[in-house]
Amino acid sequence: MSSSTTVFVSGASGFIAQTLVKQLIEKGYKVVGTVRSNEKGDSLKENLKAAKLQSENFTYEIVKDIAVKGAFDDALKKHPEVTVFLHTASPFHFNVTDIEKELLTPAVEGTNNALQAIKTHGPQIKRVVVTSSYAAVGRFADLADPSIPATEESWNPITWEQSLSNPLAGYVGSKKFAEKAAWDFVEKEKPNFTLSVINPVYVFGPQAFEIKNKSQLNTSSEIINGLLNSKPDSKFDNLTGYFIDVRDVAKAHIVAFEKDSIQGQRLILAESPFSTQSILDLIRKDFPQLDSQLPKGDPSQADAWKKAESKIENEKTRELLGFKFIDFKKSIDDSVAQIIG
């Protein structure tokens, strides 16, 4: 891929996507992003400019609702220069009333709409990368089982019906069924493009640009922000899982379309396991000035993930990508430094 390549990024104002757009511009790519409003598009352009990056290489198109049939048609018709499509747009929030209507259907339809638009209006597009989630791969929440490892071949066993039981199950289901839809599309339609899929775990790390509104961080960053806003006597849920840094998630999207060997592959982006307690312990150690304001929790529960999480085996992904992931300490420290800065 040369730097004259134009890359299409759906959902460009999302947490991962902003870092992705930033890295693409830094590497000399031209970027067409979709956003839900002019305000979001202008804000992203201004942020790129403020970061002294070539903001003229970023343009945006408005797609108010990715689940509407033909949502991406006009944007692709207007940009015949696009040869790579990175589909990051998907609903990710838990304040929903109708799980099927607000999470499951939009995720599946959004993916189908993007791929159908590429097939019909973007025959010159050769590479497509879809942002899925570890939720589509591994046994999650109630289904987690430490005795069953998760690999790039694994699928979450959740059913459509199980997905309707609560918003977290709805989110998990939306990721699984949207990713299934992408692979099914390629299988059935035999389009001009190759597909690869990125499946990140909990994504930590700093926002791409200076944070203007600290009350609205992405859902994963809220875990760190929630701890920083707690009081010494606050109680918290000791959440467990695996983490990956947002800068590595963005980088993986780029490597995924640049490298021939990654075409047709699923990648699991996970660096190491964590618990809310282990985040807290690290913050208190590395930011002693915050120690007196934070709860102590129960340090003996720092490795609670051992009993609660399926083991992730993603050696294949690491080998295909060929770069070393940012470690837990750097990811959390950089996140905290930005929030308190």
UniProtKB/Swiss-Prot annotation:
One of its GO terms (biological process) is methylglyoxal metabolic process. It catalyses: (S)-lactaldehyde + NADP(+) = methylglyoxal + NADPH + H(+). One of its GO terms (molecular function) is methylglyoxal reductase (NADPH) activity. It is found in: Cytoplasm. NADP(+) binds at K40, Y171. Its EC number is 1.1.1.283. CDD domains: AR_SDR_e (cd05227). One of its GO terms (cellular component) is cytoplasm. It is an enzyme of class 1 (oxidoreductase). Keywords: Cytoplasm, NADP, Oxidoreductase. It comes from the Eukaryota. PANTHER family: NAD DEPENDENT EPIMERASE/DEHYDRATASE, STEROL-4-ALPHA-CARBOXYLATE 3-DEHYDROGENASE, DECARBOXYLATING. Catalyzes the irreversible reduction of the cytotoxic compound methylglyoxal (MG, 2-oxopropanal) to (S)-lactaldehyde. MG is synthesized via a bypath of glycolysis from dihydroxyacetone phosphate and is believed to play a role in cell cycle regulation and stress adaptation. Has antigenic properties. Elicits a specific immune response in systemic candidiasis human patients undergoing malignant hematological disorders. Belongs to the NAD(P)-dependent epimerase/dehydratase family. Dihydroflavonol-4-reductase subfamily. This is Putative NADPH-dependent methylglyoxal reductase GRP2. It comes from Candida albicans (strain SC5314 / ATCC MYA-2876).
